[in-house]
Amino acid sequence: MAERENRRGNRRDREEAAPEFADRLVAINRVSKTVKGGKRFGFAALVVVGDQKGRVGFGKGKAKEVPEAIRKATEQAKRQMIRVQLREGRTLHHDIEGRHGAGKVVMRAAPEGTGIIAGGPMRAVFEMLGVKDVVSKSLGSANPYNMIRATIDGLKKEQSPRSVAQRRGKKVADILPKRDEAPAAEAAEA
């Protein structure tokens, strides 16, 4: 049985070589296009893909059949992946705000054991990213496309203390707040 190849190489091997990605179907819509003879119906799928180790992407696909729309969305999501630095491999480094259109998303780092406190499409992004503890709130648009784009926008803005220190020409210890001094300062004020 001969394997089919496309212009970029062996397609089947490439798909089998990337099983480390998990995907989550966020939304599927029935869409219609009005043509001369009536309406043509199709489907639009929104998929989030990630390796649960700090990489995530989303894609949308349209087709006449649901499986084909999901396949197209998954391929687009794999092409549009971004890398996010996670603190201790479980949460964000700092509070972030993301925007897209009328959608606004606020994400906050959370202590260990908090879990993912997020609604709808944001939860799918965090699960595929590998975040274990986060608190988030969606303000404005509840459209899943806008919520995911706003979440990705916020995640792109995240910076690790190491990158901030490197950019400023300082040490990481100078960037991070000192944990021992914070309670002592509060006790001195009281």
From Swiss-Prot:
S5 DRBM domain residues: 21-84
Any matching Pfam family: Ribosomal_S5_C
Domain of life: Bacteria
Biased composition (Basic and acidic residues): 171-182
Keyword ATP-binding (UniProt): no
Alphabetized UniProt keyword annotations: Ribonucleoprotein, Ribosomal protein, RNA-binding, rRNA-binding
Region (Disordered): 156-190
MF (Gene Ontology): rRNA binding; structural constituent of ribosome
One GO cellular component term: small ribosomal subunit
NCBIfam families associated with the record: rpsE_bact
Designated name of the protein: Small ribosomal subunit protein uS5
Originating organism: Ruegeria pomeroyi (strain ATCC 700808 / DSM 15171 / DSS-3) (Silicibacter pomeroyi)
